Amino acid sequence: MYVVAALYHFTRFADPDALRAPLRSIAEAGNVRGSLLLAPEGINGTIAGPRAGIDAVLAHIKGLPGCAGLEWKESTATAAPFGKLKVRLKTEIVSMGAPGLDPADVGTHVAPAEWNALISAPDVAVIDTRNAYEVEIGTFEGAVDPATESFRDFPAWWQANKHRFANQRIAMFCTGGIRCEKSTAYLKEQGVEEVFHLKGGILKYLEDVPEDQSLWQGGCFVFDERVAVGHGLAELPFDLCRACRHPISCEEKADLAFEEGVSCPRCMDVHSDADRARFRERQKQIALAKARGEAHLGAGD
């Protein structure tokens, strides 16, 4: 059994580059894999590994400047969710194209237990800050879908649509809390006064709120091998198209357009014959590695 920890924390790192090697060393020593991003505005990532290794990494992060209040979401997985460890430097821990925002000036956190009451209020507009392919498999009842392909598209979407939300309070949510928290900082910079975000994101809501009281509909896409989870963070029967990186259901896998690692109904007409030939070769190498009991990994970070 693997422990999976999803985390982020906004704080000011004077020299994030200096934090990279020690963090990587602690993770490697504990057999922890996954992805961690360091930037001047903080840290973000999802990691998986044995209990002792995860505890060591989290303790190290909590000891970093301004990170004593670090919070994270835990779940478990029966298979290793990540094949390798990446610790990378970025200009933002979540790319919005707005690195100058003050992450300390954000909207009001709303606990999962209080979320239903907020989003049911008639003067509240609920906005899903995730990408379109994530929203497709699940969202909150009545939420606005910006239909963005990337989080970087959100500022432009807001500028084009903000007139729709005049005189309304704004409630925003995302997978683990980081995108909606940064979105509230952006909206506050734009002059929106009453803006809220779901503390801990959808994952915390699904963990805390009983299914019979939930306003969540469908599954929640996650960026690891589980692909999607539901209430209680139980894994759902979704897979990932390795060609377009979008979630696919059992029904879509039964479609004639689906070929493992090569195409799915969504991307069948998007990629060229040359692309598909390359994907087939990659899939062949993955199968050969699996038959030998080896992991098919790219170069380390």
From Swiss-Prot:
- Where does the record place the Rhodanese domain? 120-214
Its biological purpose is as follows: Catalyzes oxygen-dependent 5-hydroxyuridine (ho5U) modification at position 34 in tRNAs.
Q: Name one GO biological process term.
A: tRNA modification
Q: Which InterPro entries match?
A: Rhodanese-like_dom (IPR001763), Rhodanese-like_dom_sf (IPR036873), TrhO (IPR020936), TRHO_N (IPR040503)
Q: Which organism is it from?
A: Jannaschia sp. (strain CCS1)
User: Which reaction equations make up its catalytic activity?
Assistant: uridine(34) in tRNA + AH2 + O2 = 5-hydroxyuridine(34) in tRNA + A + H2O
Keywords, sorted A to Z: Oxidoreductase, tRNA processing
Q: Which domain of life is it from?
A: Bacteria
- E.C. designation(s): 1.14.-.-
Give, as one word, the top-level EC class: oxidoreductase
* Organism phylogeny: Bacteria, Pseudomonadati, Pseudomonadota, Alphaproteobacteria, Rhodobacterales
Gene name for this UniProt entry: trhO
Q: Is-annotated flag, keyword Ribonucleoprotein?
A: no
Q: PANTHER family per the record?
A: RHODANESE-LIKE DOMAIN-CONTAINING PROTEIN 7-RELATED, THIOSULFATE SULFURTRANSFERASE/RHODANESE-LIKE DOMAIN-CONTAINING PROTEIN 2
Q: Which family does the record assign?
A: Belongs to the TrhO family.
The cross-references to Pfam families, in alphabetical order and at most eight, read: Rhodanese, UPF0176_N
Stated name of the protein: tRNA uridine(34) hydroxylase
Q: Which GO terms describe its molecular function?
A: oxidoreductase activity, acting on paired donors, with incorporation or reduction of molecular oxygen
**Positions of the catalytic residues:** 174
